[in-house]
Amino acid sequence: MAGALKATIADSRGMNVLLILNDGPYGTERSYNGLRLALSLAKTTDTSVRVFLMADAVACAKTGQTTPEGYYNIGRMLKGLTSKGIEIGTCGSCMDARGYSDADLDAGICRSSMAQLAAWTLEADKVVTF
């Protein structure tokens, strides 16, 4: 089984992957699991990863998140991705609807748009939605 997994990962090099997150940072683990996948994909050679936050997932990009000790921190996970050069966009309309401004976003995360999501989707070899 492990050999098959390694072969699959080796075959996926050179791919462009877009992850779209929809759920808020805490409550369900969908965004958490999407970011876990993004971090794992970021470790593979020649794989380009982008993350787009929309709907309640725009709250994942909120600066200054504090969680109890031992609990996962979505903000830290996003910082781990941006430190690797991974592009993270947030739906501007979704931000506006929830009262978020650009100043609310962690460093390296940018307000984006449906036009940007459309472009990223067309450039992606695979799109995964959480």
Model regions: which residues?
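Short, Lys/Arg-enriched N-terminal segments with co-localized hydrophobic residues
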Residues: A2-G14
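Short, glycine-rich nucleotide/cofactor-binding loops
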Residues: L18-Y32, A61-T66
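Histidine-anchored nucleotide/phosphate-binding helix
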Residues: S31-T44, V51
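Short internal beta-strands
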Residues: A38, S48-A55, I88-G92
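Short, active-site-adjacent cap segments at secondary-structure transitions
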Residues: V58-A61, D96-R98
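Short glycine-enriched, charge-decorated loop/helix-capping segments at active-site entrances
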Residues: G64-E69, L105-A107
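A glycine-rich helix N-cap at a beta->alpha junction
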Residues: T67-C94
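C-terminal structural segments of small proteins and small subunits
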Residues: A97-F130
